[in-house]
Amino acid sequence: MKHEDPVARLERVMRTVTAIVARPVRQFLTAASNHFASDCLLHSELARVLMADVGIEARTVVGFAAWRLGPGDGDVIMHVPRNPDALPTQQEVLFHTWLELDFLIADITTYQLRFKAESMDTADGGHTSVRWCPDFIVVRRGTVRSLEAVRDGHLVGQAYYCAASGAFQHKIKNGFELDPEDVEIARHLMINPVAGVVGRNHVMGVPHAPALLRTHNEAAKAHQ
């Protein structure tokens, strides 16, 4: 009997678990997040708790990230401050969060990249080509590209992740607490894939919320 490589096995398990927890978190926050597309810490912490429920002890990491969405010069989303060594202030709090387990990085917010690109285009009048917008990603830390490679290259689907200093991470995480009701809703959606959810974003017309909810509901019906 051929034994599976431990590294490959951990990556496979992490990818499976990430898919399981990403769906309910995405479904819930698309409907109800007060700061949709600026809520990475909430995404990561909810996912961390759900992973712990199934025995995966990942940790939330605060840092900086960039994603290459298309081949054009401007087809990049970057969450990188001008001075990554400076502590965050009220005037500039530019960061991203994701989950890490051993050598693996899991980001369940990448489904928001299209929305972020469209928001950026609305603000600056540009046009960002979005050829890559996965529901989530799981990558080995050693395969993450440099900021320069993502920013200046043209290979679609490349991502950059870099953890911030301990002091920076502490300042971002300090005082953040999950609402127990949010956790229970996410847990309910995880164990009940056919359950639907309608929240403030759906009612108030936040871009993409209705379409994303329809997608989630169609996926749920497929399980029936």
What are the language-model segments listed below?
Residues M1-Q224:
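A structural boundary/capping signal
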